[in-house]
């Protein structure tokens, strides 16, 4: 009995000590290899130093393909803190016949060698004779089981506490059964790892994620928003949707079991976030305003354009239906790109445009005809609805511009002064439709030639008469013209107009880019 108890206690101490040392990592360097080094502009081979938070563990990883018994290495390098890599000194893939092999390990250069040993189920033969157990066996068993159970609970609790944010271990994308839509070949079966939540909304949330050596955005929809996810995927998959001013699409995925399914949309990641978030924290110069506004207009103009005869097919005209500053993202150089096509309509010849239910989008940005429920269900009518919302976004930009000879307003969404933060549909109908009010264009904005031109353009975008509104192409040309004709030198305290041009002939309203 004494010997059994000592043995059980020793096993318990070993189990607890293994949990106590979690979090240590001795991985400082890993073998580096990138098969796509020319495209990614990296070294092809070398040694990579691993960096990370002190309380995080670091690992090495390797991915490879086995084609006709030939090993083709895809990537090797450092890997982030990952439960699946803990205490693995050898880089071994154990999954049964994966398309792309992936392994991770701990220890310097441990990914120099990698191997594939699939786990196999071992069945015990039933014909073996049962040997009598020694009398102390049951005593030892009864002593060990409770202690091991306690040790297991302690270890599991520690793991859950320390890694509760790592809800998604690294996975190979696309999955074997993504369901409709089909898996995206652009992902190339690369390891994808979620890092942090960047935004939450009615659709779900947006994660910053790592796809090998680059950051991407992963928009995760709950299953009840499947229609929005499906619509975004279909719009992004149309011919000709690769454009500098439209958010870059990478892939769409269906994750989880039939009981608990999440829908993923993977796009390029932009650290500056949305135009709305940027304007909350920053003011903009005249040149910055013009650059953001022009690139936003070019993105919307391209979206609205019907382009036949492209190499990959016919790009139809597309109405966004939810243009707002939250759905305009900014690249590092402040180039704008249009995002979020969950409500978009595509106008393909001979096909239905889809759900043309009138009152969709964000109330604050709804055009008068949408608020009235008096939409003409034709293509041009939907494009003009986008232009009304674009006028409001341009107003947001103007309200944060330092070029005007007056104070810069605190950032506000459109109609906050008139209605407040949470307008009802009835509030919007009263102010926009019946009273025909719009956000205030400050008098001192009009004193500057360029800002005066911008204010005129804004008013023509949000005109109550939908047919009188400017096209996105015309807005882009006007802003280019404004910037060219108005040369402004700004300092911290002075705005000097060097060239003022009046009586300018603007491009026609239906001009396209």
Curated annotation (Swiss-Prot):
Record has Cytoplasm as a keyword: no
Cysteines paired by S-S bonds: 30-60, 50-78, 85-104, 91-103, 105-110
Signal peptide: 1-19
The EC number(s) this enzyme carries: 2.7.11.30
Keyword vocabulary terms for this entry: ATP-binding, Cell membrane, Disulfide bond, Glycoprotein, Kinase, Magnesium, Manganese, Membrane, Metal-binding, Nucleotide-binding, Receptor, Serine/threonine-protein kinase, Signal, Transferase, Transmembrane, Transmembrane helix
Pfam families per record: Pkinase
Glycosites: 43, 66
InterPro entries (alphabetical): Kinase-like_dom_sf, Prot_kinase_dom, Ser/Thr_kinase_AS, Snake_toxin-like_sf, TGFB_receptor
Catalysed transformations (reactions): L-threonyl-[receptor-protein] + ATP = O-phospho-L-threonyl-[receptor-protein] + ADP + H(+); L-seryl-[receptor-protein] + ATP = O-phospho-L-seryl-[receptor-protein] + ADP + H(+)
A single GO cellular-component term on record: plasma membrane
EC class (word): transferase
Any one of the GO BP annotations: BMP signaling pathway
PANTHER family recorded: ACTIVIN RECEPTOR TYPE-2A, TRANSFORMING GROWTH FACTOR-BETA RECEPTOR TYPE I AND II
Family: Belongs to the protein kinase superfamily. TKL Ser/Thr protein kinase family. TGFB receptor subfamily.
Record's protein name: Activin receptor type-2A
